[in-house]
């Protein structure tokens, strides 16, 4: 043993990490799209590889910057890496998409993804280390008291999402945008959870598998929860093929879904998943009851809410099962030392839910405000000409059909059209037509894109930081 070389843990950072990310994302299936939607092709995901060489992946953002563009880019990357473990086929069949199928599941694509995954996870979830503290001495009794103190039943007050949708200028548009955010999770429901039912760890494993069986409709496809969600989407005029609306997924929606893949993929975080499982199953009862009422208020009797009403019953059972049949036996078997991780999983998930509520509410407000933000162009542009803000400017010339796939900026920007016509996209079903001399204020962290609708469009992007300083 004296001649054994020293062990060097794997680590990727700096230029080597950036190059590895670019190598992964330049796979042709990850290139920009010529359309806002993906059409029944679960292997194509727009990662905007042309931007990735310019991002810093080493400095973990704090919560205040977690909705910046680099985080969105990382969440899109992680979604693609995680989902290479799952089996996807187009609803219309594989014919004509065989090359994309092979490119997505190839050993090279999967190996490149796994190589960058730990660094991407550090970037995506590292901020939670500063957001959650589980110090002190924990016992089975204090854990029970903590779980009893959690308010999973909800109150009478409207949630931020309910306020955003019901207060929107276009409630149906807002509700569709909301439903689309769940597609990465609900269409492959329980897939992250499946990562934790493999292996050998005693009775709790069998209890967890019972939860999975319920999610999969007891082996009956028509009652599988993802099938129920497809019907919900279709009942409000949306398509149900996987990742059709990829470009409309918000940063926080991918963050929430990826969190469970992160916990499930890294088994050293197993007990965090146990905590997150308990909280999500317990709180989903109130969430689904509210979702049923909300969708019926917006769409009337035409909406199919069976997905949500089914969960009202089943998740009452799952919450009790997670506590009595999974958490309690695991603590008895492995001791109080695992309790801080269980609590951490709950608290981290609660932080992510807060971020998700904020992100979605801000996006709906941004979509509703498009006419006013277009009007703001003139005074903001005048302020720039007067020198109120010394803003960097990008001069762009693009041909007809050039699609700027959805992204966001880390500060406010002003889009100014010099000549030509642009369709400015601010969300699903939300767009402006901008002509020469017009423009729009682009708010920090808000998802948007653009399409050129003239033979040529000349425009400018002014990085103003805070548009109010131009007024």
UniProtKB/Swiss-Prot annotation:
Disruption phenotype: Deletion of the gene abolishes SZN production. Mutant accumulates L-NMA. GO terms for molecular function: metal ion binding; monooxygenase activity. GO terms for biological process: antibiotic biosynthetic process. It catalyses: N(omega)-methyl-L-arginine + 2 NADH + 3 O2 + H(+) = N(delta)-hydroxy-N(omega)-methyl-N(omega)-nitroso-L-citrulline + 2 NAD(+) + 3 H2O; N(omega)-methyl-L-arginine + NADH + O2 + H(+) = N(delta)-hydroxy-N(omega)-methyl-L-arginine + NAD(+) + H2O; N(delta)-hydroxy-N(omega)-methyl-L-arginine + NADH + O2 = N(delta),N(omega')-dihydroxy-N(omega)-methyl-L-arginine + NAD(+) + H2O; N(delta),N(omega')-dihydroxy-N(omega)-methyl-L-arginine + O2 = N(delta)-hydroxy-N(omega)-methyl-N(omega)-nitroso-L-citrulline + H2O. Stable and active at pH 3-8, but loses its activity above pH 9. Shows reduced activity in phosphate buffer at pH 4-6. Fe(2+) 3 binds at residues 407, 409, 448. Changing residue 407 to A: Accumulates the intermediate L-DHMA, but cannot form the final product. Pathway: Antibiotic biosynthesis. Its cofactor is Fe(2+). Fe(2+) 2 binds at residues 215, 281, 315, 318. Changing residue 318 to A: Loss of activity. Changing residue 315 to A: Loss of activity. Residues 177-328 are annotated as: HO-like. Coiled coil: none annotated. Binds 3 Fe(2+) ions per subunit. Two Fe(2+) bind the HO-like central domain and one Fe(2+) binds the C-terminal cupin domain. Residues 397-459 are annotated as: Cupin. Changing residue 281 to A: Loss of activity. Changing residue 225 to A: Loss of activity. Homodimer. Involved in the biosynthesis of the glucosamine-nitrosourea antibiotic streptozotocin (SZN). Catalyzes a complex multi-step reaction: the overall reaction is an oxidative rearrangement of the guanidine group of N(omega)-methyl-L-arginine (L-NMA), generating an N-nitrosourea product. SznF first hydroxylates L-NMA to form N(delta)-hydroxy-N(omega)-methyl-L-arginine (L-HMA), which is further hydroxylated to give N(delta)-hydroxy-N(omega)-hydroxy-N(omega)-methyl-L-arginine (L-DHMA). Contains three distinc domains: N-terminal helical motifs involved in dimerization, followed by a heme-oxygenase-like (HO-like) central domain and a C-terminal monoiron cupin domain. The central domain catalyzes the two sequential N-hydroxylations of L-NMA and the cupin domain enables oxidative rearrangement and N-N bond formation to yield the N-nitrosourea product. The central HO-like domain can bind Fe(2+) and use it to capture O(2), forming a peroxo-Fe2(III/III) intermediate, which is an intermediate in both hydroxylation steps. This is Nitrosourea synthase. It comes from Streptomyces achromogenes subsp. streptozoticus. The gene is sznF.
């Amino acid at each position: 043993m004296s001649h054994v070389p020293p062990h060097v843990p794997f680590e990727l950072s700096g230029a080597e990490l950036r190059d590895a990310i670019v190598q992964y994302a330049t796979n042709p299936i990850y290139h920009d799209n010529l359309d806002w939607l993906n059409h029944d092709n679960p292997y194509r995901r727009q990662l905007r590889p042309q931007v990735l060489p310019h991002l810093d992946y080493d400095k973990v953002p704090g919560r205040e910057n977690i909705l910046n563009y680099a985080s969105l880019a990382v969440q899109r990357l992680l979604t693609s890496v995680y989902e290479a473990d799952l089996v996807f086929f187009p609803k219309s069949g594989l014919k004509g998409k065989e090359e994309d199928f092979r490119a997505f599941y190839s050993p090279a694509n999967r190996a490149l993804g796994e190589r960058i995954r730990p660094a991407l996870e550090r970037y995506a979830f590292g901020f939670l280390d500063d957001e959650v503290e589980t110090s002190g001495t924990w016992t089975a009794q204090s854990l029970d008291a903590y779980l009893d103190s959690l308010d999973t039943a909800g109150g009478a007050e409207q949630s931020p999402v309910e306020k955003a949708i019901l207060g929107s200028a276009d409630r149906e548009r807002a509700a569709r945008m909301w439903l689309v955010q769940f597609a990465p999770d609900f269409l492959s429901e329980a897939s992250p959870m499946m990562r934790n039912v493999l292996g050998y760890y005693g009775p709790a494993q069998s209890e967890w598998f019972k939860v999975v069986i319920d999610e999969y409709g007891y082996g009956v496809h028509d009652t599988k929860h993802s099938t129920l969600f497809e019907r919900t989407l279709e009942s409000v005029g949306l398509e149900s093929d996987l990742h059709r609306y990829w470009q409309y997924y918000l940063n926080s929606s991918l963050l929430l879904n990826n969190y469970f893949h992160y916990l499930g993929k890294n088994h050293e975080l197993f007990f965090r998943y146990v905590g997150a499982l308990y909280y999500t199953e317990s709180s989903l009862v109130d969430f689904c009851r509210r979702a049923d009422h909300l969708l019926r208020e917006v769409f009337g009797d035409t909406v199919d809410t069976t997905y949500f009403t089914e969960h009202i019953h089943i998740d009452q059972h799952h919450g009790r099962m997670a506590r009595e049949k999974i958490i309690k036996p695991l603590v008895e078997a492995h001791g109080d030392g695992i309790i801080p991780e269980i609590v951490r999983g709950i608290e981290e998930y609660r932080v992510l839910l807060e971020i998700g509520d904020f992100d979605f509410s801000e996006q709906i407000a941004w979509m509703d405000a498009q006419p006013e933000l277009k009007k703001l162009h003139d005074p903001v542009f005048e302020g720039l000409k007067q020198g109120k803000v010394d803003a960097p400017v990008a001069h762009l010339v693009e041909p007809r059909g050039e699609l700027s796939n959805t992204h966001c900026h880390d500060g406010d920007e002003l889009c100014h059209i010099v000549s030509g016509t642009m369709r400015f996209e601010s969300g699903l079903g939300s767009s402006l037509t901008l002509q020469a001399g017009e423009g729009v204020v682009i708010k920090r962290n808000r998802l948007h894109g653009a399409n050129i609708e003239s033979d040529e469009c000349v425009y400018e992007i002014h990085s103003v930081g805070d548009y109010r300083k131009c007024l």
